[in-house]
Amino acid sequence: MRFSLLLLSLLIVPALNTAHGQTAQPDPTLRVTLESAYENWKAAMTTGDIKKWEATTAFSRQREIENRIISQRLPFPQTLFDDPMDSPQLGGLVSLGVLSNGFAATSTYFGRANFGNATGTEIPDNLLVLHFLKEDGIWKFDNLRLVRIGDDGEILLQIRNTDFSFLNGAEFQPAEQLPPIEQPVTTPDMIAEAWIDATGYEVKVYVNNRLTGTFSNLKITELVNGGVNKGQNLIRIESKPLPESSGGAPKVEVAIYAAADAESQANRVFHYRPAGTPEASVTHGFDVK
């Protein structure tokens, strides 16, 4: 029951979505500043320097990562620096452009981004998107995304022709607003995972008044922020039907599984599956032994 880290910074996007109303503007003058911010963050990760990591990482991301590690009953910051996945070097990648809205920015690259792949492993060409937030006038690294292009000949042709209009797609846009800062968590009695089926709905799940996540028209598992404790726990589920959806008949189902540690068997401690239309908001208590 161990959840991947890489700072919560690596998100793999399988396909391009060009339907997006672009609000950020190109700003090539930021490229050197952003690359310097990324290299400083990367150096902190390589050397295991927690002070430098705190100085180079957006604060909202710091808190999210620390909470995620502690929620798994793992030591912080040791677990952060033990992550086996490396952050890629920018050398050898082709810069495609920088987008900024003033408080958030992205810098996108094309090429064979190496995340510590074993020697001899073939690395395909992909798009690497670095995300940054501006705090107190200083750009801080937030996360990175790998956009897989596979054999998409159209994208490859656009890149060869220096047509980077696909950067208008949602995958390449900076954050539209600054993310909220989570409250810190303490080490829980048990690690917990939420299993969610939100087919045709937007579902928000709160466990012990902490947001586990917001899920729209998908089936997914997610680490419960703050875990669960022995004895009584509370869960709130908010469900909102989506105007258009695909993937089957609309339904909402939520289950919580808990385990003493990452190596232990997880047991279901809560299950919600309404027979009819789910209520807009329900709150239940559940006991963990």
Regions found by a protein language model. Give the residues of each.
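Surface-exposed, charged secondary-structure patches
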Residues: 74-129
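Phosphoinositide-binding peripheral membrane targeting modules
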Residues: 221
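Hydrophobic, helix-prone linear segments
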Residues: 1-95
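Beta-strand-rich recognition domains
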Residues: 29-32, 39-46, 58-62, 66, ...
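Short, flexible loop/turn segments at beta-strand junctions in immunoglobulin-like
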Residues: 224-228
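Short beta-strand segments within Ig-like beta-sandwich modules, predominantly Fibronectin type-III
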Residues: 211-217
